[in-house]
Amino acid sequence: MVGEAANGQDAIRVANENCPDVAVLDYGMPLLNGIGAAREIMRVCPRAKVILLTMHTDDHYVLEALRTGIKGFVVKSQAPADLMRAIHEVLGGMVYLSPRVSRTLVQAYLTKSALPADPLTPREREVLQLVAESKTTKEVAKLLGISAKTVESHRTRIMKKLDTPNTAGLVRSAIRLGLTQV
């Protein structure tokens, strides 16, 4: 183990400093969730393979992770032995899904569920997560290294895309999309 992180931004910093073979990320990390952190870690350290540790098993979470390039998806309730298996599989060049997740994906495939495309850009998802975590516009701007005006522009586009008129609706959407937890 080369490092530990308290949030998504710390995880990126640790990965940038150490470029690990495998990064195990919690989906529900504060500041930047596991998916957002994974995107950035894979950008700064292309050889790193990411395993997502989560309690979510709905097909849209799994598909979002796979589209991002995550190589392992481990359900927390199945963790210790499952995580070790995932690390070995991923290091061997395979993709690993917890058995519970595999069943969910097969069921979704068999019922031919139409999964809607994500309407938000990665940056909009970051802004939405931080807004849902009760960050002010100034705090979001500082954390993301952008202006407050840009944050407001993102927020306006997010509200339009998600068809919600207020912050409460944004928080509900963030929970539904798995960007934050209650």
Predicted regions and their residues:
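Helix-turn-helix DNA-binding segment
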Residues: 107, 114-150
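Short hydrophobic/Thr-rich beta-strand motif most characteristic of the beta2 strand and flanking loop
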Residues: 1-6, 14, 164
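Short, flexible helix-to-coil linker/hinge segments that flank and couple to helix-turn-helix
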Residues: 60-126, 179-181
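Active-site beta3 strand of CheY-like receiver
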Residues: 18-24
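Short amphipathic alpha-helix used as the core "switch/output" element in two-component signaling
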Residues: 13, 35-47
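Basic, Lys/Arg-enriched C-terminal extension of HTH/homeodomain DNA-binding domains
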Residues: 159-182
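Acidic catalytic/metal-coordinating carboxylates
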Residues: 7-10, 31-36
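Active-site residues of response regulator receiver
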Residues: 26, 54
